[in-house]
Amino acid sequence: MRFTFPLMAIVLEIAMIVLFGLFVEYETDQTVLEQLNITKPTDMGIFFELYPLFQDVHVMIFVGFGFLMTFLKKYGFSSVGINLLVAALGLQWGTIVQGILQSQGQKFNIGIKNMINADFSAATVLISFGAVLGKTSPTQMLIMTILEIVFFAHNEYLVSEIFKASDIGASMTIHAFGAYFGLAVAGILYRSGLRKGHENEESAYYSDLFAMIGTLFLWMFWPSFNSAIAEPGDKQCRAIVNTYFSLAACVLTAFAFSSLVEHRGKLNMVHIQNATLAGGVAVGTCADMAIHPFGSMIIGSIAGMVSVLGYKFLTPLFTTKLRIHDTCGVHNLHGLPGVVGGLAGIVAVAMGASNTSMAMQAAALGSSIGTAVVGGLMTGLILKLPLWGQPSDQNCYDDSVYWKVPKTR
């Protein structure tokens, strides 16, 4: 850790600086016009029109995701700190990879949409991070960030440019992809020594409150996430409204099913922290489609139910039978709701809510899951090499391995 991590971080940042010097320029007014398909003259005002949405997404990435993962009682520093590290590297690398793909290897101009998409690429890695939380080193996370974004960007390009599928809120390309990529990595990195659990793999009263802060930030800003890159006008308005009501319906369903499946009808904080967000994930694919508010509420309700049931029944099954230990339960918050979103998109297209093809929507869902699993397995094999400073079983879920921590915790 003393030399491997600093060397890796410095080399990667030098590489980012060199790549930005070779490929990235400021965006010009003419480029803005072409990117947004606007024929009349405009100015850089479009940058500042989208900047509030970008800031909302930015808060979700750095505050929402970071604090959502602070539920482990002795892993708060790593949850927030490594989240910051991964996101900072991810947005730089995502800018480069996505830009090169779009420009076919030529220089490209950077604008507000590039910055939003860069944050989206970082979000994908943060979702996967949740599956291996507490069991990996900072060096391993840097490597995973570099590799995952390459797979993510190519799949996103395939979905949007080749299949021409609709996935404005990225239920398939970000949420399902990130979840199944993380599960594949977790499967390769499975530790038999942790099959009976670990004393630090639990929450405390204060850590659950911190995690709930992350939930609230994500919940409030999710309409911005799903509408940030939508076509201005009716589609962007629909994306905001549909997400707003899907999230609201999801909360009631999540609370109801949490009480239903828990002993004596008590609410489980794990369900409330996570399943209440599933509606935002699931409505993403068809957020900008004319599915009507009641349609978005149906999607949100289904997502909340599926998420709670996943936490209650599927997570233990994955650990004991499939040897996939999902620390944060990303399969239930992002994976299953992402699949629900993909299926909802197919149904919406079949009902005439979009001009895209049902076959291409299905292909996009299959591609996202397939690429994620293959990429995750390959990445997991690389991360398993014994030179990245991964913690021992005994030291998992403990900040003191990689951080200076106070004596009193």
Curated annotation (Swiss-Prot):
Belongs to the ammonium transporter (TC 2.A.49) family. Rh subfamily. GO terms for cellular component: ankyrin-1 complex; membrane; plasma membrane. Erythrocytes. Signal peptide: none annotated. This is Ammonium transporter Rh type A. It comes from the Eukaryota. It comes from Homo sapiens. It catalyses: methylamine(out) = methylamine(in); NH4(+)(in) = NH4(+)(out); CO2(out) = CO2(in). InterPro entries: Ammonium/urea_transptr, NH4_transpt_AmtB-like_dom, RhesusRHD. It is a multi-pass membrane protein. The lineage of its organism: Eukaryota, Metazoa, Chordata, Craniata, Vertebrata. It is linked to Regulator type Rh-null hemolytic anemia: Form of chronic hemolytic anemia in which the red blood cells have a stomatocytosis and spherocytosis morphology, an increased osmotic fragility, an altered ion transport system, and abnormal membrane phospholipid organization. It is found in: Membrane. One of its GO terms (molecular function) is leak channel activity. Homodimer. Heterotrimer; a RHCE monomer interacts with a RHAG homodimer. Component of the ankyrin-1 complex in the erythrocyte, composed of ANK1, RHCE, RHAG, SLC4A1, EPB42, GYPA, GYPB and AQP1. Interacts with GYPB (via the N-terminal); this interaction bridges the (RHAG)2(RHCE) heterotrimer with the SLC4A1 Band 3 I dimer complexed with GYPA. Glycans are attached at residues 37, 355. Glycosylated. Residues 24-51, 101-113, 164-167, 230-239, 292-295, 354-362 are extracellular. Residues 1-2, 73-79, 135-142, 189-208, 261-268, 319-332, 384-409 are cytoplasmic.
